[in-house]
């Protein structure tokens, strides 16, 4: 069974809620195990990431970048980087901010650069914005129009689960896409070694 880690930091519950929704999407695809891992819990043992075939990073966007706890975990992987021990793993990213734009793109680019330096393979978000097909904006998948990763918006001081239905739909579809991509990658690798 292939394993996916969703590693994240969530200060107010919003990023954790999206992480769980991504995990729900992954679980709709057979043959995968998903673990939700908090960044702070991995600081002392980043080598735990070696047990996974795919890594999905999540963070709120704070002042145009990842949160300090996720950045601390990224920095703690220096020993893994020196030996390129994460090379070839599938990777993706997601972020949440209080505004529709909120400079989330720079957060995803930080995650992307981190994964590229480790030699991982990045999975974007291929979901077309559904509002262009007549779906009401708040119900539309990928309503924020992000292709480099998953973006979601939660109003300031809202409960952790308070997202537009479209953002929840996007998280489920993003998880499914990542899961199918991982299975295709491993099926191709199995054929090469047959």
Each language-model region and where it sits:
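Glycine-rich phosphate/pyrophosphate-binding loop and the adjoining helix
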Residues: 126-194
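Conserved alpha-helical elements of sugar-nucleotide-dependent glycosyltransferases
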Residues: 14-18, 107, 170
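N-terminal beta1-alpha1 ligand-phosphate binding loop
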Residues: 2-29
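A short beta-strand-loop structural module common to alpha/beta enzyme folds
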Residues: 32-42
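Short helix-capping segments at alpha-helix termini
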Residues: 25-32, 83-85
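Hydrophobic residues within alpha-helices
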Residues: 18-26, 111, 174, 178
């Amino acid at each position: 069974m292939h394993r996916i880690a969703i590693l994240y930091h969530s200060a107010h519950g919003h990023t954790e809620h999206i992480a769980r929704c991504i995990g729900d999407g992954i679980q709709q695809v057979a043959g995968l195990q998903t673990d939700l891992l908090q960044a702070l819990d991995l600081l002392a043992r980043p080598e735990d990431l070696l047990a996974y075939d795919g890594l999905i990073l999540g963070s709120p966007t704070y002042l145009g970048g990842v949160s300090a706890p996720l950045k601390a975990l990224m920095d703690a992987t220096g020993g893994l980087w020196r030996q390129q021990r994460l090379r070839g793993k599938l990777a993706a990213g997601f972020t949440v901010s209080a505004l529709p734009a909120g400079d989330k793109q720079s957060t995803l680019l930080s995650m992307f650069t981190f994964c590229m330096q480790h030699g991982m393979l990045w999975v974007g978000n291929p979901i077309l914005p559904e509002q262009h097909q007549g779906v009401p904006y708040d119900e539309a998948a990928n309503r924020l129009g992000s292709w480099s990763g998953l973006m979601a918006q939660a109003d300031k001081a809202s409960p952790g689960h308070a997202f537009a239905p479209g953002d929840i739909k996007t998280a489920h579809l993003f998880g499914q896409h990542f899961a199918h991509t991982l299975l295709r990658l491993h099926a191709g690798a199995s054929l090469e070694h047959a």
